[in-house]
Amino acid sequence: MKTLFLAPTRNGVGLSSTALGLARALERQSLKVAFLKPIAQTYEPRTDDSVHFARAVAHLTTPDPIPLTRAEELLSQGGEEDLMEQVIALAREAAGEGSDVLIAEGLALNERNVYAGTLNARLARNLEADTVLVSSLAGVTPAELADELEIAAQGYRRSDGSGLAGFVLNFAPRELDFGSLMAELRSRSRVLASGELPLLGVVSLDPALRQLRTLDVARALDAEIINAGEAESRRVSSTVVTARSVPQMTNLFTSGALIVTPADREDVIMAAALSHLSGTPLAGLMYTSGSAPEATIQQLCEVALTSSLPVLRVPTNSFETASRLVHLDFRVPHDDPRRMDRMLDYIADRLDTVPLGARLRAPGVAGERRLPPSAFRYELIQRARAANKRIVLPEGDEPRTVKAAIRCTEKGIARCVLLAPPEKVRQVAQGQGLELPEGLEIIDPETVRGKYVAPMVELRKSKGLTEPQAEAQLEDSVVLGTMMLALGEVDGLVSGAVHTTASTVRPALQLIKTAPGSSLVSSVFFMLMPEQVLVYGDAAINPDPNAQELADIAIQSADSAHAFGIPVRVAMLSYSTGESGSGEDVEKVKEATKLVRERRPELLVDGPLQYDAASVPSVGRSKAPDSPVAGRATVFIFPDLNTGNTTYKAVQRSAGVVAVGPMLQGLRKPVNDLSRGALVDDIVYTIALTAIQATQSAADCG
């Protein structure tokens, strides 16, 4: 195992987010990453920021750091060796077994810990680590930056010239002339000119990643929350301090705007209320000077002021409030994992870690490829981009769907087709402060519905479908989208944000039909567990499959796992393991396991297995010592829908695990259902899944 030590060159360079972003980038290369913050950053008793987010967002198991007070006590008493021994013990605990690389984050530099630079160098040396320097372009000239990197590198460079893994530059302006910058840096720094300190990445400023939630602003200003609304999810992208008349300010009442006003500005309050009711998701309305609007105004605007619009009150006047807003702390609070997750993805996307990853891999060790969650998501998006498929979204004016389609179009994940009146889609986008990208296709169902009547009658002629019946059914946008898929005009369909599962699946069964060799349609969820991605099937479609159907589900799920790069070890689940139980339910699982082995002898499959015997190595060794699957299953096949759906939701909620899916299996062409509570990210990943499935379907047909 190799160790990387991340060290800052000065204060405020984004050390913690870079450390965790690097961890994510290396995980995408299927390296098993461990994380360590050896010494706590502050004297506060709360969990260190980087440790908290390593656990909560990066899903890395890491021990608590040595308290800063204890470290300083040891250093002041000449106990540096004792301190280093404790650090090494922590490193071994953090690395555990089988890790490819340990990322250790040093101490950030500040005016209190003047010793941090020297201590960081000693930590790196004692951990036998290669060092990644983290620096910033903020507030320095290229010449100053070159000198800073050269001096810092000398503190971590070993006598044989090794010890430097590279450097990362944060807070780069978007208009940076990269070529000129690197030329000047290399002209002044020997370690840069020689290549001893390679550049790992330049991370530009992204204002969206600095956006605090309305709740964060309320906490920082000690504001009274009059109406919480969606304060936990809305983000402040701009602040509007009302000093002018309303007609001169309405153009500022945009998505993410925080309206700061005295409570006696009834015109501003009513304008904010109207803006909210028209669909603009303002970040909030803040009354200054500890005041409240007149009762008549509150009554007039009651619908807006008691709904999802956050309403706050602060004791300071507007000028003082505006001044405090300018000086807010933009660090990510512990209860905002979504923002940190986006930040880590943003950083990982901008790090070139392929050469570094090659160095970190132990030569000559051929182990099974792991697929941690971040690598799964990354590869999902990359493969979808490569597929370049056209995906129809029948719920074309649903806000989450519109936002997901915009994101997919901008990132090149898929060529999305929204089925909805174009004007309505534009209104939905504007209400969310979004612009429709040029490549996003919008089709008005009213203008195309008629051309699908005859083809639909032909497809359903064996069922006696008439033209009037077809016309009536095509009023449903899901049916219309399914016909587009049946005729090959699109490559896949995603629906379910507002429609039921039956509304999505039924037209597919009638018009798309099952794939050759498939006797049924089933589903899987990709469970993004902290260590790896697991497959759960079927947790969405088949209520009580018989043995033959259960075997089909297992084979379909195994093939899906393989298609997405997940090692296939299938556990046929039951309430008993091996021969310990009996009864109709157990016999069904035994028979299904037998059928899978007969039909696909190359698959690693075993059952019946209890969930703990399938997933926990120690339990698997105890209950099924001869099983090739017990304790290390990756594909979990549930005996019925009740068990599968309950388990998936329990794991998802109790363990905070992201579940991607359900992904439908067994159809001739890909159709996927969404949960009606799906988030925008869920829809994006489902679109990506569908695009990849479309590639596989085309290959199977070809």
UniProtKB/Swiss-Prot annotation:
The record's subcellular location field reads:
Cytoplasm
Q: Quote the protein name from its UniProt record.
A: Phosphate acetyltransferase
Q: What is its main location?
A: cytoplasm
Of the GO CC terms on this record, one is: cytoplasm
Going by the UniProt record, its keywords in alphabetical order are: Acyltransferase, Cytoplasm, Transferase
Pathway assigned in UniProt: Metabolic intermediate biosynthesis; acetyl-CoA biosynthesis; acetyl-CoA from acetate: step 2/2
Q: Where is this region: Phosphate acetyltransferase?
A: 375-702
Write out the catalysed reaction: acetyl-CoA + phosphate = acetyl phosphate + CoA
Named from the GO MF annotations, one term is:
phosphate acetyltransferase activity
Q: What is known of its domains?
A: The N-terminal region seems to be important for proper quaternary structure. The C-terminal region contains the substrate-binding site.
Q: Which CDD domains match?
A: DTBS
GO biological process annotations for this chain's record?
acetyl-CoA biosynthetic process
Lineage, top-rank taxon, reads Bacteria
Q: What family does this belong to?
A: In the N-terminal section; belongs to the CobB/CobQ family.
Known EC number(s)?
2.3.1.8
Q: What does this protein do?
A: Involved in acetate metabolism.
**Which InterPro entries is this protein grouped with?**
DRTGG (IPR010766), P-Actrans_bac (IPR016475), P-loop_NTPase (IPR027417), P_AcTrfase (IPR004614), P_AcTrfase_dom1 (IPR042113), P_AcTrfase_dom2 (IPR042112), Phos_Acetyltrans/Butyryltrans (IPR050500), PTA_PTB (IPR002505)
Short name of one Pfam family = DRTGG
Could you give the subunit structure recorded for this chain? Homohexamer.
